[in-house]
Amino acid sequence: MKKTMLAIILIPLVYAVAGETVADDEVFFLSAPQLDGTLIDSWGTDAVITGSTLMNRLWKTFTVSATHTLREYGRVAKSVNSTAATKCTHLCVPGTVLKLSVQATRSNANNNASWRFARPVITNMHELNETCIPMEYDCEEVISEKTSLNTLSITIYGSNDLKKALGENSTCNKTWTQGCAIATALTALYENKSVDARKLNILRGTSYTCLLGYLGIGELEPNSPCWTQLGPMCYGPLAEQVCVTAGRNPFGVVPRADRPVSTGVDCRVGSRADLQFSGLTKGLFAERGCDRVFVRCDLIDPYDPPATAAEFELHVECRSSFRVSGFPGEGEDMGLELAFNNFGLEGLIRTKQDRLTIITGIFDIRNNKYNALVINWIPTPELLDTFHMFMAELDTFRKIHRPTVRLGVVITGASPFVEQYNFKLLSGVVDMVYIHPQIQPMTSTPTLTCPMPIRSDSLECGEPHRQCPGFDGYRHLTYATRFLLGHISPEKLTLGLDVSCQLWGRRVRQYDTNWYFQDNLFSEVQGGWVSRGYITDVIQPNMTQAIQLNGCHGVFGPELDILLPSADATPYVGLLWSQPSDLEDAVDFSMALGITRFSIEGALGDVYMDSSENLKTVSTVHEAVTVRMRAHAMMEEMLGEGGLAAFDESMIWANVTRSTGTATTGARKRRALTTQGPDGVNRTIPFSASVQSGTSIVRIGTGPKMVCPGIIASVRGLLFSRTSYQGFYRLTFFQNLYVTQLQNLTGCTAVKPEDLPVITQATKVPSVFAIDINTFGVVNGSEYYVVGLEGTDLVQYSPQVKQSCAFINTNETFNQTFITIDERFFFTGPRPVADGFVIPAGINFFGSDNIMTVDYIDFNVTCMNYSNPSVQSCIATVCAANVTECTPRATLLCNQTAAILLDFQRSNELLKNSLVDLDLEHEKVKMFAPASGGSVPTSDKFGLSVAAITMSSAALVASTAALAVATLAASKIDGLQAQLDKTADVITELGDSIALISAKLDRNIRAVNGRVDDLQNQINLQMLAMDTNFKRLATGLKELGTTTNERLGEVMAYQQWYQQIMSLTNQVTQGAIQIGYKVGMIRTCVKSLLAGTMAGCPTDASSFRDHPGLTFRKTVRALLYRDQKLFIVNEVPQTLTARSVQVFIPSPTITEKKVCWPDYKLMHVDGKVVAPLECTGKYCSEPIEATDYQECLTNPSTCRYVCGDCYRGICYNRTTEDISIKFENVTHALSVSDLTSPLFNSIPQIVSMEMEIQDLKLELIQLQKINTSVHMENITGDIDAMKATIEEYRAEMAKLRVTGFGEWLKYFIYAILGVIAIGALIAIIFMAVKCYQARALLSMTAYQPVPTRPMGMMY
């Protein structure tokens, strides 16, 4: 029995030293940063050496028992035959005392004792006290209240049950704070309980907006921090679950192990402040609000730069003796800031060697006694690429030589230059970023700087209450990085269309109507208009502070009801700007939303500017407003009252200059966005910043703000949605697409599609406008499927197809890197996932729960056919009673019948040829008859055999099992022969029962194949009816006179002959066609059967009916020809599950000189890496384990590699550490490693599970699963009689000590009972020859055709 062992992990993990051995297959271990060989005393005082082993002359190994008090959260992890921990099982709070056992290696080299430790282990999990909470989570998860979005942080900060145990006893009495809203959302997710959405409004527009998507409120943003930390999750306290799956993650975000960064405030001291050093104390820094201290180092003379890179260190002034009274000293809380100068470095950083020389010199400054390094370099646009290369190379050097030093960078926050930074590169290189203020303070006292990590899950806005320099830039950077950290640029943010309604208010006063904001104008950051970085503050009168609603900070001071201001309140919009065009665009956007009244009373946000800058702001706003108000009035005049008139927008702006602008800002009021003229066309003014179709956000209506996921397009006032919302209409020619008019949208209430009304079908193209639903473009032709307006009515129009078959192809209108199918994302190119990349291969079906189904083809066909001499001519039929006198009269009557007889003869010959073809196919399928060398069936013996099918040894067991459903094995035929000879009497006794069963089976078979039999019977009945009717008519006519009777008799005889010939021709032609179709079907079917498929065979089995594509898969397990029937046994799955299938490419291994890619063909199914699938079309067998790749993970020496920068369309740049694929650049954290180290030491292990494969047993109960398309009469009573006879026979055979056939008879009876159990009463191959003989005897009686008399003798 295995020994259960526990251990604790403290992040970051410290893995065991080389050479460590673990005796057990499964261990739980402890690894902590403080156990580094130098702090053994921190374990406690009860460390005891329990044993020692001499390893060599210098090293000794001891087993040490000790106790350890956790200083932070401890993680209990389990590992199986690996040093890599991926899943943790317990979480221990700080202060927990643990009993440990650890192997320590002590060195006495050079008389200096040093220690090295393997991984500490706890051998008894029951010793963990109640402060260690059992739970499952990823060991790499970060615990952070500020970014508490992963499973571990949800457990700590979201669960009420665990707050006490984990030392978190705070409660949320003020639900309007951001922290309480986060706790409320996380608690709802953790406990799967409903939550009041109104308590979460404060999260909108923040870094935690994405939490709302997990709760079913709105839609999760694809590049949100929630996906990185929470991953796929379902929340379903109500009837309908809300699930965020991998299919909704279009960028394949790969979580990186980012080091946590404190969000405190740093202080900078200039290098020339050495005369002030004696006065710098810890108290002074605390008074200034400093958490860390940085010494700034400058070039001695920026205008006299070093001549070479080697002289760089000599030209930097940085005091090495700097100390602050009260601080612990250099290294712990001290940092170094290097100020670069573009002019001084431009000639020294062009080559990689020069940059490496400078980097080496940087780390030599101050003798490495600092814990953080900040590069203060604002490059020119020409040096920006060089700057990125320099930072990447600096980070690589740091990771190798100084991994404990944190790296930061100072960047500019000015727009538009900030958008030029490569934040995807910097986010993987630096730990924090500082904004360079526009006004640089010149002081020798400590000045504040505010660090900010460049991660979308931890975007801070500086610290506004600390008054950090450059605070405006921090706020702009918040928005810039939200776009630029994604995998697409801001101008391409058109993944979806959210419909948001802005909350407006209107106050009617004596002199005017005033529109005002009731919510933040820019509460959602989704459109390209944010690129210049202005932010809106909503200001209430008589307030001491501005309420900032841009998502970075909550409300300071008392709670304010900003949504419902007082009646006499006048709101103000404060704008931050960096250039006049920002303000102009803001005015454009406001006017497009209906704002026509502006009041300029000052400037907000320019707290760092002087009075001249404030004056410039006022002047710029005034000019922007007056010019646009004048343009607004001109466009109003051009629009007129009759709807949308033709106008040239560029001409208007060319004519409207600052000199023509009116002096007042109270110009004519803007018409409402949804006001319609007589023709029903929505009038809008297309300002340059107005909301247009195709942008990623549209604000409409007068109700509260709402988000409708699933809206995919907005064209000409029509909304198209993939989700069925109340108020939308269904389209009849396009499923899963719904449409409504924009002005009618009042809410986002999802309903069932069938509950929506169907849109009206128009008979012509809509006259107002028509939108092609394939391209969402406006068209005017009649060859498109369109939706549009006919007057004021919403209608659809389908093209009038003039030919019998029409194929309409949609032209390609755009290219994108992914497509959506049923609301899921599928990629057209590679994308990164954990440990590799995936390339979509499509959606395939995987089968399970296989059963046997049986079908058969009957070759026993009865057809009526006539030889040409047996069909009398027209003259012989008409003149049969009086040949001499009738013939001259009938000649004229019958001289047109040659063509009629010719048609009949052709049809008759066609039928004969079809029967010959059928007989030929019949002879072909006899190859599936029992083997000729076996037992020859006789009237009193059962003839059973195995179909002769060629197969591989691997398929032999399965095929034998399939044949057992239809027959016994051929190897038993010879052994049964002697016993069969002694069973004649028993067979005779069973004959009557078998005959009865055969009769019932015949009736069912006739029901299936009786179409020809019924045809024959109908012809005979028609002939009999005609014979009787004409005889009666002839008898009555004789009374009118002999002459008249003869004439009428001749006419009626002709009519009867004509009708019979027409009927026979028609029936024979139909028979020929039916037989011809059957011959073609059989010929195609046999070809498919020989290939092992049912592709060309008719079948009514449910698996084939529901999935026709399954017929192309090799499902045929047995074929047997018997008694003019070909029986087909298929093995098909009862369940077919659709799964996403992707090609998997493992991540490469990066060395200093090479990029090596594991060379394996792998697939990715359900999040697992598997071997290549065995598929036919879209139908696949269950995935199997990739044993060779697993062996590579377990033993890297067995791996196959292909080395090179590019592999299968994916390239790696060793300088920037970027993974480049066809449609994007992905920063994929790949560590530099040595070729001698394990190549996959960071990849979670794959546990190999061997499946127990048992021999397939031919259990008779399997017959209960037979599924057939033929349904037959119940023969239970007949079977009961047979049971008694068989039991008597078994008893007699037992007396004779003869076994085998009696057991087979028992097998036979239970096989029939198994068929009865599922209602499919068909004997198939289990029936005896006597059964078929009886069936043949009954068939001869049932199918005997009525003899044909000469046509002229029928009346």
Swiss-Prot record:
Pfam (any one): Spike_torovirin
KW rRNA-binding (keyword) present: no
Annotated glycosylation sites: 81, 112, 129, 169, 173, 192, 542, 655, 682, 744, 780, 811, 815, 860, 865, 882, 895, 1213, 1225, 1267, 1274
Protein name per UniProt: Probable major glycoprotein
Signal peptide: 1-16
Residue ranges crossing the lipid bilayer per the database entry: 1308-1328
Organism: Ictalurid herpesvirus 1 (strain Auburn)
Location relative to the cell: Host membrane
